[in-house]
């Protein structure tokens, strides 16, 4: 029957469009998740460096304090800065792991 064949062709075209749209959507999502992972990794590395620098500053101020060349307020401020930077580092690590998980979920790994 001609109308049945025509209807089947129309359904086929609809399904093909749906498939193509899904592929495009998945490709866009993949690119976005790759970008998110790269950005999270860069932030993680920056925060890691910040922790290293802030730790050195704290250590130096602590040594100065031992020799009477720095106040307890300076040690407290450096310690607070170190804790803050460590917190940012942990958050960056968490963001990186979450970005990796999201990409792996998309890739079914």
Task: Label every PLM stretch briefly.
Residues 42-91, 104-105:
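Charged, solvent-exposed structural "stalk/scaffold" segments
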Residues 6, 77, 98:
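Solvent-exposed, flexible loop/coil residues
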Residues 1-52:
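Sec/SRP-type N-terminal targeting helices
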Residues 34, 38, 90, 97:
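Conserved active-site region of classical short-chain dehydrogenase/reductase
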Residues 98-109:
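Short amphipathic coiled-coil heptad-repeat segments
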Residues 16-23, 55-62, 100:
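Structural signal for well-ordered, non-membrane alpha-helices
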């Amino acid at each position: 029957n001609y109308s049945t064949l025509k209807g089947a062709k129309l359904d086929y075209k609809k399904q093909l469009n749906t498939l193509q749209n899904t592929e495009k959507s998945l490709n866009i999502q993949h690119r976005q998740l790759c970008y998110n992972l790269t950005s999270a990794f860069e932030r993680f590395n920056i925060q890691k460096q910040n922790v290293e620098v802030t730790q050195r500053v704290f250590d130096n101020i602590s040594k100065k304090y031992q020799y009477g060349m720095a106040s307890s307020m300076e040690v407290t401020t450096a310690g607070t800065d170190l804790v803050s930077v460590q917190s940012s580092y942990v958050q960056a690590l968490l963001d990186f792991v979450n970005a990796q998980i999201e990409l792996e979920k998309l890739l079914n790994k």
